[in-house]
Amino acid sequence: MADEKGTWVAGPEVDVPTTVAGGCFLGVSVVATADTAALETGYGEFAQEARALAPTYHPRSVCTDGWHATREAWRRLFPTITLVLCFLHAILKIQDRCTGALRHQVLERAWQVSQATTKRQCAQRLRRWAEWTPTHLSGAVAEMVLKRCRRRADFTPASDCPQAHRTSNAVDRLLNDQDRVLDAMRYCHATTASARLAVRAMALQWNFHPYGARLRRDQPSRVSPFHDLNGFQYHPNWLHNLLIASSMGGLGL
């Protein structure tokens, strides 16, 4: 999953292109703008680091919101990747404009679309949603629903990758944690380069931080995001585990 979070560096707003999987940050950087070229550079850091580890690395799919520059950046970095449009982002604005029973009906039909297991089923449910809309909705809400239904080609590819995420809320959870840290420090105060190092340090700390007592009590087998993703840890002390994992066997020292 991939998304960008806005933040500030000594006043001007910047974007933080972030790649997430398995509850861990896989890539994070800072770019001055959210256009295609800048995001290609930002997400390109993840691509370079992944290929340094596995030269033939190529993700099968990525789930993003509808921002064109994000999707185009990933298409340029990985030409054969399957781009999955986040269904949650597609309906949030619709949800905000509906109330009462009508809101329930709209969300029920959106849920049916999201649960489709094949391309054909997804296309059929989008078509039925589009047919239902003119007789039950009007104005801006109707146009928003029909606009989503017309993007059938962006939603159906998820059926080609059964393991692909259909929503990007997993990346939102990590970005929200990072945003709370940035807010507590009143954002960044020096340069884009130092801000990049700061968000990468935050990402590392998240990946290796030990879970709290309540989670460990309820799920004793879980230790940290790193352990969840890899199924092991190098050392029971989280800081030692971070230092060993990031040492690249001494090659990075």
Task: Mark where each language-model region is.
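Intrinsically disordered, low-complexity regions enriched in Ser/Pro/Gly/Gln/His and often acidic
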Residues: 1-4, 104, 122-125, 199, ...
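RNase H-like nuclease fold core
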Residues: 1-61, 68, 72-73, 80
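Alpha-helix boundary/capping detector
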Residues: 17, 88, 100, 200-204, ...
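Short, charged/polar low-complexity linear motifs in solvent-exposed/disordered segments
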Residues: 19, 26-27, 44-46, 112-113, ...
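Short, solvent-exposed secondary-structure capping/transition elements
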Residues: 25-28, 103, 214-215
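Extended amphipathic alpha-helical interaction segments
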Residues: 48, 54-63, 70-195, 252
